[in-house]
């Protein structure tokens, strides 16, 4: 029996509209939350092998904002790009094209979560207009070593093996229940048994929502390209980093180093949580985001 979604009641009170737009050959599906006339509009770039659902626990706690959450190309309901590679440069080009296609009257606040933090930071550093930048669980340490060299090599071999298999076998490997469960168990830090169960169920629901094995393998290679600090000096907008005290994917010492690389940035550390801030501490994440937005001139 499934665990009820903790934020379902809050989310049900927010108007949600689904749209579709083509960007770099990707039929990109996106969801628009909240009032169209909100003071702030946020565009979200989600994490690796996730989709727009992932940040909904936080979105549900910010009903006053207009939030636009696309599925990145090749994940969720969005098809892969045909006019760009599925690397950080390709995804940053897609993000810039997506925001341009929205036709917003003013540049939005851009929020990057985990993998999306690299995409968003790189896009803004290379000239994409934005009002501000918010990074949740940002990749602030070299991703090849952040989680441990051994684990990274093993994971890289896993995705590399999927490339050489026929599609049905590759999908069977990538979507194996034990593989997804192991990944989920390594990320969860909460002691709340009900919340832990719900998070595992969420990963099983959405972690396998990718278009094809090659795109998901390309995405993993993209996730190893660079930490956000490489592009940080080129970000000329106010920036908020929201990090987990116990994040093993991108440890806290890297966050303290990285925040100093941005021209105008602050760091909020949420205690007793790891790489799943959006699932485990959505109230704290929403508070940090809203306080940051309130201080924007």
Model-inferred region functions:
Residues 23, 31, 69-115, 126, ...:
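Active-site loop/oxyanion-hole signature of alpha/beta-hydrolase fold enzymes
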Residues 265-297:
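Catalytic active-site module of serine/aspartate enzymes centered on a nucleophile-bearing elbow/loop
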Residues 246-250:
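Acidic catalytic loop of the alpha/beta-hydrolase fold
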Residues 235, 241-243:
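Short beta-strand/loop motif that positions the catalytic acidic residue
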Residues 132-167:
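Flexible "cap/lid" loop of the alpha/beta hydrolase fold
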Residues 168-234:
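Conserved alpha/beta-hydrolase catalytic His-Asp/Glu region
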Residues 117-128, 133:
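Short glycine-enriched nucleophile-adjacent loop
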Residues 26-79:
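Conserved HGGG/HGGXW glycine-rich cap/lid loop of the alpha/beta-hydrolase fold
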């Amino acid at each position: 029996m499934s665990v009820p979604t903790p934020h379902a009641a809050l989310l049900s009170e927010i108007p949600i509209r689904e749209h579709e737009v083509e960007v770099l050959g990707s039929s990109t599906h996106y969801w628009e939350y909240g009032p169209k006339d909100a003071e702030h509009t946020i565009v979200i770039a989600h994490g690796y092998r996730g989709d727009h659902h992932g940040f909904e626990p936080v979105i549900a706690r910010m009903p006053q904002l207009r939030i636009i959450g696309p599925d990145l190309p090749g994940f969720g309901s969005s098809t892969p790009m045909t006019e760009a590679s599925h690397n950080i440069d390709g995804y940053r080009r897609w993000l810039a094209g997506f925001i341009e296609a929205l036709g917003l009257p003013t540049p939005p606040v851009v929020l990057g979560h985990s993998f999306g933090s690299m995409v968003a930071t790189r896009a803004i550093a290379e000239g994409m207009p934005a009002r501000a930048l918010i990074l949740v669980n940002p990749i602030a340490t070299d991703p090849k070593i952040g989680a441990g060299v051994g684990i990274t090599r093993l994971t890289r071999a896993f995705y590399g093996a999927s490339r050489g298999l026929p599609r049905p076998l590759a999908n069977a490997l990538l979507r194996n229940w034990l593989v997804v469960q192991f990944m989920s168990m390594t990320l969860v830090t909460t002691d709340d048994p009900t919340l832990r169960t719900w998070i595992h169920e969420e990963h099983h629901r959405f972690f396998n929502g990718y278009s094809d094995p090659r795109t998901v393998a390309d995405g993993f290679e993209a996730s190893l390209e660079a930490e956000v600090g490489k592009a940080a000096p080129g970000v000329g907008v106010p920036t908020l980093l929201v990090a987990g005290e116990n994040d093993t994917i991108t440890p806290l010492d890297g966050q303290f180093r990285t925040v100093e690389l941005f021209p105008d940035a602050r760091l909020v550390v949420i205690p007793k949580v790891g790489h799943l801030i959006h699932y485990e501490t959505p109230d704290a994440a929403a508070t940090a985001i809203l306080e940051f937005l309130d201080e924007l001139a």
